[in-house]
Amino acid sequence: MTGRQQWCDGVLAGPGGAMTDEVGVITGPLTVRTTAVPGGRVRIEIQYEDAEEWYTLTGSPVPDRGDPAAVHAAALAAVRTGHEAGAPGGAAPA
């Protein structure tokens, strides 16, 4: 892999928050981290702002479709929208 491999930005979760595999829905000020991984996929993780523990955004990892930065932007948009947001292009929450 070449170029940038990780993106990390703060976001305020919309109503209904974001769905994680480990703890369910989280809300409020969050940080989203997207990391390119081998095989043309990206892993999307989320944490409470300034926390230490990261959680997997439900549906992650997802295909990067050749533009992992766009997947990161889509993940931020999904979390801003809320409604138990999961990874863009990933599995829907149960």
State the predicted function of each range.
Residues M1-R33:
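Negatively charged, low-complexity tracts enriched in Asp/Glu with abundant Ser/Thr
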Residues T27, I46, A70-A73:
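A ubiquitous, low-specificity "background" feature that marks scattered single residues
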Residues T27, Y55-T58:
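Generic, ordered loop/turn and secondary-structure boundary motif
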Residues T34, V42, I46, A75-V79, ...:
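Amphipathic alpha-helical interface segments used for dimerization/assembly
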Residues P38-Y55:
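A short, structured beta-strand/loop element
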Residues E53, P61-A94:
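Mixed-charge, Lys/Arg-enriched low-complexity segments
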